[in-house]
């Protein structure tokens, strides 16, 4: 690391700043897991974002290990692996049996199966610089697919004319993170680090523009099933869009779920429900909505 700071002082500075920003983003879900711990329940939250974040961190550590002078990528993604593993462990402790089974299968499929296959193919079918090229494009492809996830949140903001699903502070911090890591990749002449962050910056600017456009608008009332349709997701355990969660934007999970659970608009019944019958259907709809919006967040870790 000392050699890097002497040869690329600006790259070291941007890499260090990127480490700080990304580390703070990793810690963003802490309030969510504090709620899970206090309530002894996962409350409809998904494990998908954390499994994908762990997979991304593993990929970038492997990539950094194949190169020289990539200590800054190793440090932040190592921290990410530890933090995401803790999140997943806590989730497994308090999740219902069905969610535990789904999370275990997802871990085996993605973090063991897919990562193991990538490791095996790059070691057996390529060597030297070619191995770095192959793995670099794998990392770029994964990062780009993850950055597509914010499209559902952007569409939801446009439909509802409400920015409560998209906090400005989060969009701003993620945009700054993309700029910092782009400059880091540019200065060390690593296109695999720089390229994905161009897309990340673009989505960040779009989100901040939408925030400026709709922050004073009167929100439209959106029913639970409309939110689900806008995010194009399924139930808690089988959300298709959840697989596209981003590594760095996982913080949106807590904010989006809090908003949906506290500000959901319910349909008005003509007849008042019996006092003794709790509105369990509404509770189920709220949980499904929370999972749907959580599955549409964006995240990309330290790259």
UniProtKB/Swiss-Prot annotation:
GO molecular-function terms, A-Z: sucrose transmembrane transporter activity; sugar transmembrane transporter activity
Bilayer disposition of the protein: Multi-pass membrane protein
Induction pattern: By the X.oryzae pv. oryzae (Xoo) transcription activator-like effector (TALe) protein AvrXa7.
Region feature Disordered, mapped onto this chain: 266-290
Gene3D superfamilies: 1.20.1280.290
GO terms under cellular component: plasma membrane
Ranges of the Cytoplasmic topological domain: 31-44, 94-105, 155-167, 214-303
Subcellular location: Cell membrane
InterPro entries cross-referenced by the UniProt entry: SWEET, SWEET_rpt
Segments in the Extracellular topological domain: 1-9, 66-72, 127-133, 189-192
Pfam families named in the record: MtN3_slv (PF03083)
Top-rank taxon: Eukaryota
Similarity comment: Belongs to the SWEET sugar transporter family.
Function recorded in the entry: Mediates both low-affinity uptake and efflux of sugar across the plasma membrane.
Oligomer status and interactors: Forms homooligomers and/or heterooligomers.
Record protein name field: Bidirectional sugar transporter SWEET14
Encoding gene per record: SWEET14
